[in-house]
Regions:
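Short S/T/G/P-rich N-terminal loop/turn motif that feeds into the first structured element of a domain
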Residues: 1-48, 54-99
Length: 99
């Protein structure tokens, strides 16, 4: 499994969350997508998204679509995309949580 970790600075965390809700169906329809997390510190406006992918190939194939979805999710709230990084997931402990 592989992950894409993106960090953000949001002046409107609620707007950012709504933006991510608006693109979630498109994300779920992407080949090789497993699941995702959005974490928000409402006080500081810092946020992070983690998307989990079945393989490195799926992660890399989704790069341009993920870029577009990230822009669509962040534009309405004027959120700044600070970084996007890719990681291998060599180990998982427990069961992924559902919100």
């Amino acid at each position: 499994m592989h992950a894409r970790v993106s960090t953000y600075q949001a002046s409107d965390p609620e707007g950012l969350m709504e933006g991510f809700r608006s693109v979630s169906d498109s994300l779920e329809a992407t080949d090789g997508f497993s699941h995702a997390y959005l974490m928000v510190d409402r006080d500081s406006g810092k946020a992070m998204s983690i998307t989990i992918w079945d393989s490195e190939a799926a992660l890399m194939t989704s790069v341009s679509q993920a870029d577009e979805l990230r822009k669509r999710a962040t534009q309405p709230s004027a959120t700044t995309i600070e970084s996007v990084q890719h990681y291998e997931i060599p180990m998982i402990v427990g069961t992924p949580a559902r919100a």
